[in-house]
């Protein structure tokens, strides 16, 4: 089966929240078929590497299989938190978009939603 290295947003969506200098990002598979690859390959090590440039020091990962989701708790990623950060996005809401774009996974055509623009890449 052909697999392409695609951004995780091709098979999942995400939400971000914050508490102090800690961000949490939930990564949720669109389809049941996308859950196993997210569970297996979206590791805390990969997420830490994506956010290290922002000062992240540790990532904890929690599985929520009934929701087809992972929750990543990213420590020290918000520049001190909403009250002390000088960043434009002090709550870290855009971090979910950053994760969706930067985390690349080997995705097969059958994991994509039927309206995915990435389906064209498999026909090229």
Model region roles, listed by residue range:
Residues 1-124:
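Long, contiguous binding/interaction regions
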């Amino acid at each position: 089966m052909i697999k392409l290295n695609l951004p995780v947003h091709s098979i999942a969506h995400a939400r971000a929240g914050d508490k102090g200098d800690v961000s949490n990002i939930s990564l949720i598979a669109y389809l049941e078929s996308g859950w196993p690859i997210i569970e297996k390959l979206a590791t805390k090590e990969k997420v830490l590497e994506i956010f290290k440039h922002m000062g992240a020091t540790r990532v904890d990962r929690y599985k929520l299989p009934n929701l087809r989701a992972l929750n990543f708790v990213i420590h020290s990623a918000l520049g001190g938190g909403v009250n002390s950060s000088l960043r434009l996005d002090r709550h870290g809401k855009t971090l979910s978009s950053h994760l969706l774009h930067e985390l690349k996974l080997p995705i097969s055509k059958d994991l994509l939603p039927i309206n995915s623009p990435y389906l064209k890449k498999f026909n090229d």
